[in-house]
Each structure stands twice: as structure tokens, then as C-alpha cells.
Amino acid sequence: MHRCTISHIDPDSPLRHAAHPGDRLVSINGNPITDVLDYKYYAYDPQLAVCLRRPDGSEHTVHIVKPLGGELGLDFETYLMDNAHSCANHCVFCFIDQMPPGMRPTLYFKDDDARLSFLMGNYMTLTNLSEREVQRIIDLHISPINVSVHATDPELRAFLLGNPRAGKTLE
């Protein structure tokens, strides 16, 4: 799977004649698309230059006009368009670690992903965020993000989350 690979085009999509399943979404109005947040943010405008890459590597740009906020009608191989960020903590209270064995595998995935927090309401601890990701959250106005704090004392927070970096996250 390649990042941002189109799996389906809605029949009413403004790209229905230009995009095909298997194409990759490269950029919108010159902004590289790396995941679902870029896609939703940059596709909001009514006038778009959409760059697509065919499976053979050739690229072409399609200029479209659509209603402000109107959907492009593209589905991708995965919802986030890349892998979810997994949790690096070892929390003493982790509910996933307390689940019984034998349940479906997706229930055991520990995410700590700002995108899933914003889009799905999941909680995150902020211990996974790089400075670049924090800046991106600010630049794209990604809000709200649900933060699981548990403690503000750095030493106690590091202990509870089982992660020495957790104490520095709230600085």
C-alpha cells in the first residue's frame, strides 16, 4: 500500500473523469498530501489544482471548481492514508493491557494519534508528538484534541505513563 492511494471515486465526484482507483493523490494547490488531515484541510477551497500520480509514475494536474467545503468524493485504501501512530507508553492503568485474550485484533491496538483524537474523539497523551507535529496541529488549526493528562507533576506523570519523556510533555 502506498500513502494516499485512491480506492474509490464517487460517481458525483468532480474528479470522476480524471482520477482512477490506484492513482495516488500527490498534492492539492501545491500542498503535499501526506494524510487525511492534509486532504480535508486543503480540499476545502472551491478552486483546486489536484495533482494525481498514475501507477506508472506519470503525474497530471486537474483544475476543478466545487462548492466551498464540498467533498472531492475520493476514498483511500486506509482512512488515515498512512499508519496510525501507536502508543509508546506503558501506563500502569492501560485498559488495553487489561483486556482478555481472544478478542478481535483491532481492539488491542494502542493508538496515540492526534489525527484520531481530532477525527474520532480518541484520547492521546501527547508523548508521541514531535515538534513538527505540534507545529502542524497549529498550522492546520486542528482542534479539539482530547488529551489524557492523569497528572501534571512531571515525576508522577512519567511514573503513571511508564515513559520517562512523559514528564516533559506538558512543558
Q: Which positions does each model-derived feature cover?
A:
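N-terminal functional module detector in eukaryotic proteins
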Residues: 34, 49-50, 90
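Post-signal-peptide, soluble extracytosolic/periplasmic N-terminal scaffold domains
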Residues: 14, 21, 50-52
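Conserved Radical SAM active-site core
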Residues: 59, 66-171
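PDZ-domain C-terminal substructure recognizer with occasional recognition of PDZ-binding tails
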Residues: 40-76
